[in-house]
């Protein structure tokens, strides 16, 4: 069975302000889906070159669709932080921009009603979301993605602050990076220290990779 992802023009944010950390759709930007697909294709192929398995198989840019592996995708987000930002600062009363070395890793349950709570390995297994060892394997993949992504963005004069990925697994339990790798999943700083929204960041990256 073939599976395809459609990249739409919707963007997350609230009150007309675009924010990759938001869980609500804040508007639509013409052409965003196509740009997101071009960027995702670029980064998925980069991950594969670095030995990180992804669900990406092929892409049709004109149609805005990506052909992907059919996988089981648990309702989790794997989060890596190189600096404090966003919800972490609100949760723990921390100033923005404090560095983490090594990076800070979190796993959250995708549940808007509960506010995407943090979840442990034990709870993931208790709820039947993950099998034994998959939590730690997911964190290992997250760290490896972070290293590749951080270096690639640094070459574009962008400093990676934090990002989140989703991970799926096949019938044998092998794990893959899924969904997308676009400015919708990360925060970055430019050379001026400004954090561009995901629309501006996408255009910045598109100009670099084309």
Question: Which residues does each predicted region cover?
Answer:
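An exposed, glycine/acidic-rich loop-and-rim segment of catalytic or binding clefts
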Residues: 98, 102-117, 122-130, 197-201
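C-terminal helix-cap and adjacent tail motif
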Residues: 181-210
């Amino acid at each position: 069975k073939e599976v395809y992802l459609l990249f739409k023009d919707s963007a997350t944010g609230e009150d007309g302000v675009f924010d990759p950390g938001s869980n609500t759709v804040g508007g639509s930007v013409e052409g965003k889906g196509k740009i997101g697909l071009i960027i995702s294709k670029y980064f998925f192929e980069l991950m594969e070159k670095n030995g990180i398995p992804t669900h990406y198989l092929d892409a049709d840019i004109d149609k805005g669709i990506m052909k992907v592996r059919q996988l089981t995708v648990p309702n989790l987000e794997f989060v890596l932080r190189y600096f404090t930002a966003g919800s972490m600062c609100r949760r723990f009363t921390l100033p923005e921009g404090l560095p983490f070395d090594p990076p800070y890793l979190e796993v959250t349950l995708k549940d808007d009603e509960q506010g995407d709570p943090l979840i442990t390995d034990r709870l993931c297994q208790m709820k039947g979301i993950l099998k034994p060892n998959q939590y730690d394997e997911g964190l290992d993949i997250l760290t490896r993605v972070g290293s590749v992504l951080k270096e690639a963005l640094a070459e574009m004069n962008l400093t990676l602050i934090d990002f989140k990925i989703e991970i799926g697994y096949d019938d044998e339990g092998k794990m893959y990076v899924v969904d997308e790798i676009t400015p919708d999943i990360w925060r970055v700083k430019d050379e001026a220290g400004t954090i561009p929204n995901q629309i501006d960041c996408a255009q910045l990256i598109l100009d670099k990779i084309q």
